[in-house]
């Protein structure tokens, strides 16, 4: 299949560079989510490999919300670069996975977090780097639930749309 991780890594690295040079008081945390979610340092991003993982968007959002809760920054936002529809959630100590279509249980948990972020005043901008019709359908529902934004970008055009959105949100004071 198409290489989706390389463009996503390039965008995250470029966003990191933009923020550290143009907006030095801002903080950027990079989170990776497969079956689970974890934080990585910018310096480790080039070495990130894709595993045989599902997409646990819930874990990524929960970790992002935890990090944002601890910050005193008035302007909080989430940029989510994703190449897959949500296919996995954790139930207790076990994983519930379903790669076929859009699983109602997985999607509903994910949409619930989109609504929670909206109520907390945390906009989510989603960048979709795949042309999967199920992913497009999910991203539309997710964006509506959060009142966020979505960019359906080609792998090449991903970077420029990300930076325009970041700068626009900075000017708006979000």
Task: Spell out what each predicted region is.
Residues 24-26, 76, 120-123, 146-149:
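Short glycine-/polar-rich loops that comprise or flank the Walker A/P-loop
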Residues 30-32, 78-80, 126-128:
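Structural beta-sheet core signal
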Residues 32, 38, 94-97:
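Catalytic core of nucleotidyl cyclases, primarily class III adenylyl/guanylyl cyclases
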Residues 45, 123-174:
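Von Willebrand factor A/integrin I-like adhesion domains
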């Amino acid at each position: 299949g198409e290489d989706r991780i390389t463009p996503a890594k390039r965008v995250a690295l470029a966003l990191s560079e933009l923020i550290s040079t143009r907006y030095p008081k801002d903080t950027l945390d990079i989170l990776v989510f497969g079956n689970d979610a974890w934080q990585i340092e910018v310096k480790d991003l080039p070495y990130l490999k894709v595993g045989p993982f599902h997409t646990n968007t819930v874990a990524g959002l929960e970790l992002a919300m935890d990090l944002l809760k601890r910050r005193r920054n008035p302007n909080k936002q989430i940029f989510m670069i994703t190449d897959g529809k949500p296919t996995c959630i954790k139930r207790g100590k076990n994983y519930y996975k379903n790669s076929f279509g859009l699983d109602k249980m997985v999607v509903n948990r994910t949409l619930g977090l989109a609504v929670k972020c909206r109520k907390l005043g945390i906009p989510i901008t989603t960048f979709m780097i795949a042309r999967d019709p199920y992913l497009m359908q999910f991203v539309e529902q997710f964006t509506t639930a959060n009142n966020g934004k979505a960019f359906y970008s080609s792998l090449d055009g991903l970077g420029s749309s990300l930076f325009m959105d970041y700068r626009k949100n900075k000017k708006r004071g979000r």
